[in-house]
């Protein structure tokens, strides 16, 4: 019986020593997956991933009930509903609600569109250098124009400079911006992207 306990003790001590001496630094190295650093778009996979994420962002705009509510209510398809916070009634464009900056989910479009525009800027700036197919850069141009169109139709004039210059990929957060006029948004961002 003694030799069995001795073997178990030796094996247990060896296993404990193995676990205590193993390094876990690789496990703790973080790989960011929700934001892009400047080197992300310097590879072909990075540019392709950026274009893929622009398609994925559509669910954050059109997948929300608030967006459907603002587009469908007042038609013969649907009428306003009610939610716990009352936002559905306020977003109703058939005249039942009172749409203001404090009573609607305008942040859903604002935040999603600008992050997608920044991704498109990164793809457009780096796509040719990486050597990807021009169609991927064209898709990024379309999405940038599409997002600016949604923004300008909803909010009027919106900023073209996200912090690094007009229509440039921004890597540092900016809390200030200058609102461009509606004609500027169309002539600098929407029409040129759709025509190239």
Which residues does each predicted region cover?
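Bacterial N-terminal signal peptides that target proteins for export
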Residues: 2-12
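Membrane-proximal, proline-rich intrinsically disordered regions
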Residues: 24-69
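Conserved, well-structured interaction surfaces
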Residues: 48-52, 56, 86-155, 175-187, ...
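Core domains of carbohydrate- and sulfate-ester-processing enzymes
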Residues: 78-86
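Short, well-structured active-site flanking segments
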Residues: 154-165
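Substrate-binding clefts and substrate-entry loops adjacent to catalytic sites
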Residues: 167-177
């Amino acid at each position: 019986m003694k030799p069995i306990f001795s073997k178990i003790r030796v094996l247990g001590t060896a296993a404990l020593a193995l676990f205590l001496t193993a390094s876990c630094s690789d496990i703790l190295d973080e790989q960011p997956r929700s934001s892009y650093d400047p080197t992300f778009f310097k590879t072909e996979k990075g540019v392709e991933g950026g274009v893929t994420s622009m398609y994925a962002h559509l669910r954050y705009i059109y997948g929300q009930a608030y967006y459907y509510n603002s587009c469908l209510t007042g038609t013969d398809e649907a009428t306003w509903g009610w939610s716990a916070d009352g936002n559905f009634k306020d977003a109703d464009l058939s005249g039942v609600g009172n749409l203001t900056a404090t009573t609607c989910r305008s942040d859903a479009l604002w935040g999603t569109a600008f992050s997608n525009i920044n991704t498109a800027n990164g793809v457009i700036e780096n796509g040719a250098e990486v050597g990807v197919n021009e169609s991927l850069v064209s898709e990024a141009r379309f999405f940038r124009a599409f997002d600016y169109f949604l923004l300008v139709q909803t909010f009027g004039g919106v900023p073209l400079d996200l912090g690094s210059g007009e229509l440039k990929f921004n890597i540092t957060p900016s809390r200030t911006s200058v609102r461009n006029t509606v004609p500027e948004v169309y002539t600098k961002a929407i029409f040129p992207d759709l025509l190239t």
